[in-house]
């Protein structure tokens, strides 16, 4: 399962700021790639001022995405604890149903709301699924197999909830500019948490 032990405050602070950095850097890099058609003239004209101002703006946007990611992460840790308490052994089954519903929602209801070609919605759902499976597999290998389903749930369901503001706008550049940093931040937090827990537990042990 996902770790819910008490982590020393300095590790929580470290997680917060390191995730901020991950969000800022990923959005800055991916922003130029995703919106290259818009920013290409800055590079062809070698306009340093516009390049730097855009870089700082994208970095700031990434910080916001990172905060959204962290709110979702800690909210899920709470939801996960309640889910285990209420559903017990059925909790994994409940999560699987919700995962499938959300993936269906990402395709069907977006297409129903905005129309257009169905393939972009399917591709987004596939990206979510593949990233979630890879990250969850790594998480399970690093911790235990019981972490696999909760990790997929977090990477799919919680990411989609965090992603809703961009989805509602339905601008392709914003949809993907928000999605990828969220996935990166969520994956980072998921894969680093147990390491921080281990360090915190080691420090709590009395020295011999």
Residue ranges of predicted features:
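Alpha-helical transmembrane segments of multi-pass membrane proteins
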Residues: 21-39, 160-164
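Membrane-interface helix-boundary motifs at transmembrane edges
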Residues: 80-92, 139-146
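Membrane-proximal helix-loop-helix units in multi-pass membrane proteins
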Residues: 96-150
């Amino acid at each position: 399962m996902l770790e819910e032990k008490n982590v020393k405050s300095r590790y929580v602070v470290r997680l917060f700021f390191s995730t901020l950095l991950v969000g800022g850097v990923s959005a800055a890099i991916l922003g130029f790639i995703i919106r290259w058609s818009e920013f290409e003239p800055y590079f062809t004209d070698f306009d340093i001022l516009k390049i730097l101002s855009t870089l700082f703006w994208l970095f700031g946007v990434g910080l916001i995405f990172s905060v959204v990611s962290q709110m979702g992460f800690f909210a899920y840790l709470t939801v996960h604890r309640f889910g285990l308490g209420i559903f017990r052994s059925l909790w994994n089954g409940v999560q699987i149903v919700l995962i499938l519903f959300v993936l269906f929602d990402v395709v069907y209801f977006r297409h129903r709301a905005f129309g257009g070609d169905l393939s972009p919605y399917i591709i987004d759902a596939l990206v979510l699924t593949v990233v979630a499976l890879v990250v969850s597999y790594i998480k399970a290998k690093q911790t235990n197999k019981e972490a696999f389903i909760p990790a997929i749930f977090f990477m799919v369901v919680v990411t989609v909830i965090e992603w809703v503001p961009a989805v509602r706008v339905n601008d392709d550049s914003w949809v993907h500019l928000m999605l990828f940093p969220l996935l990166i931040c969520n994956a980072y937090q998921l894969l680093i948490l147990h390491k921080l827990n281990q360090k915190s537990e080691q420090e709590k042990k009395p020295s011999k």
